[in-house]
Amino acid sequence: MLMPKSVALLRIRYTLEAALARGFTTVRDCGGAEGFLKAEIRQGSLNGPRLITCGHAISQTGGHGDLRSGALPASAFDSCSCHFGQVGVVADGVPECYKAAREEFRRGADFIKIMGGGGVASPTDKISNKQFCDDEIKALVDVANSYHTYVTAHAYTAEAIQNCIKLGVKGIEHGNLLDERTAELMAELGCYLTPTLVTYKVMGSDQFSAFLGPENSRKNTEVLYKGIDAMKIAQKKKVKICFGSDLLGPLYGYQTQEFRIRGKVQTTQEILLSATVTPAEMNGLGDKLGQIKPGFIADLLMMKSNPLDDITILDEPESNILFVMKEGRIY
């Protein structure tokens, strides 16, 4: 059941303030956050991380961003908006892809997010599906290039990832089923990988397993156990890795568990780089964010102890963060 937009708006203040309190001074949103939120944060009406947003994620009909049930024809949904979520929009064919991407930029998007393959939570696709035709992806990339920014793609399989990055996509979200050749290609093309391992762990737990139906749970299990292996491959092939979580709504509070999970694969320094320097570079902010240096924006955390010695302290922000500084202001 979709959350009413009015309820989502009521929860935004808490979500933003809680993320900042956990130490996240910048957050990249890959579907749903609108431009007005960035403006309110900049103006000080809301306390929260600065936002880097894509607006809505763009999906093909029947793709990961299409929330319509497969039990009814598309015409059954024409007279209502009950099937529209806050996360995605649907576009088919090159003209619609041009228009959808330009509309997101018109509304203040910083980059474009597409659904390049099947997903766990979507009702009518398989994870193995490759989504969008080549000319559609190329159209979306061309629009992003004209705005001097990038396209990132939701994709799990090696086939979907390779298809996207060969057409100019510069970011891959999730990537749980990539193989060595795919990782090599990502490294060669300078493509960024953002694993979201905590999502599958939380959704697979007894506490939240009821959120997914039987088929969606099966898909979640499939990607859960292969995500760590994919990260090992990406690390070995020197793919640029960013920190991510992909948690929605009340689950967002679990985002710091990603630090603990990544400790199984990455060194503490590599994990910290994935949450600071590398994503700043990905988003064209490498000369402003991610480091404590003269001329950089004054974002920093004051900790009780050194996360380089124990990365898991970042998963316990309430007891380990003394204060969060964003743009020189202490929160």
From Swiss-Prot:
GO molecular function annotation: hydrolase activity, acting on carbon-nitrogen (but not peptide) bonds
InterPro entries in UniProt: Amidohydro-rel, Metal-dep_hydrolase_composite, Metal_Hydrolase, Metallo-dep_Hydrolase
Family: Belongs to the metallo-dependent hydrolases superfamily.
Name this protein carries in UniProt: Uncharacterized protein YJL213W
Native source species: Saccharomyces cerevisiae (strain ATCC 204508 / S288c) (Baker's yeast)
